[in-house]
Amino acid sequence: MQLIKGQKKQNRRAKAMNINTALAAATCALLGAPAIADNSDEGWQIDTALLYYGESDRVTALEAVVAATKDFGDEHIFSGKLIIDSLTGASASGAIAQPSVQTFTRPSGKGQYIIAPGDTPLDDTFKDTRIQFEAQWTQPLREDLRGSTGIHLSNEYDYLSLAINGSLAQDFKQKNTTLSVGLSYAYDTIDPEGGRPVSFAEMVIDRGQFATEAAYEAAFYATRQQGSDDKTTIDLLLGLTQIINRRMLMQFNYGYSRSDGYHTDPFKVLSVLNNQGLSQALLHENRPDQRSKHNFYWQTKYAMDNGVADLSYRFSTDDWEIDSHTIDSRLRFNLPNASYIQPHFRYYQQSAAEFYQPFLRDSDSMPQYASADYRVGEMSAYTLGLKYGMTLDNGDELAFRLEYYQQDPKNPGFSEPGVLQDLQLYPSVKAIIAQVSYSF
């Protein structure tokens, strides 16, 4: 997952920014386009960042980003970005905590891991490296009309994503109003080590019942599908950006997304419990093979005498019955000596997918779809942080960001039989985010 957002494209050589310039830069940020340099002779603008993300006893991520933008004249702009990130640590398997020791087979089928009584089952060998490349070209097509097209490539150990995009932006009323439309197509393939699990197949665990290693491997691979699977995604975006006055800018977006293909997480399982809440088996999850989402987004930027206020709200709904609300706010205060501070607060809340179940009951019939992944369950989350940036004597910009993130899964209404009532089934996920960025 991308942990670093693209840096705002601003003219780093400016020692001060008046209100009109601030609104112009904000317009570019809202449209997702690079800001236009005052003079194409200034050459390339480079943004770099290094980010650390660390969860308590879970995932740790390091991410490096290099982004480059160049105006070749007459607003013919190229922008590119290279992202490399590495993730290690422990990832939740979806199984439920138990009052006794639990044994799990690793997703590859090679080896096992043990979970202590009362602990959330985590696979502590989670490790992955991702390389992502993006390129975008933007240019005027005629007066007040701009076109943009781009490509996206992301590669992990077992996952490949390719995407293309295109968009148009039309200005009206002396560029005070902009209408935009964008379309993208993505093709993803997944080929996990050990194969893709058969839906609701029971996890094969070697407890000494197999006479030979070959017998175990035969049982394991009987629950697997060999070869890769894929998913396609089409995204449509409609946008309206309006300059309200010399201080205020507002944007409205509507987005539609349709994905078809393999949506199941091959690394997630569900616990099957008896009436006492004790685990009887572990089954691999199964999700629907298509998903449609609608997104509604509003953002306002207000240029103050000594800074910029930024507030946004997003509502998302899909046919998995996941509804989410996101409020994001940033308040930048300009300080003496060409520096600034920017507090940040973000709140997120979502409902559970219709097929989300924290566990299955052995007395119930098997559902068509089910997942115990907390990421499709009911939850709330918040981020609280602070960024400090400064413009150096040579016009370059250096910034530091430190944030605290907490995610709180919730029980969406399932009864907890027997021993589960004495266990922590929905632990919070807490993380620290630290970033340093340098632009020149």
Outline where the language-model segments fall.
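Outer-membrane beta-barrel proteins
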Residues: 57-59, 79, 89-93, 158-162, ...
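Membrane-embedded beta-strand positions of outer-membrane beta-barrel proteins
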Residues: 46-48, 80-82, 149, 179-183, ...
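Residues that define the transmembrane beta-barrel architecture of outer-membrane proteins
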Residues: 60-64, 127-133, 160-164, 230-236, ...
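Transmembrane beta-strands of outer-membrane beta-barrel pores
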Residues: 50-54, 84-88, 151-157, 170-172, ...
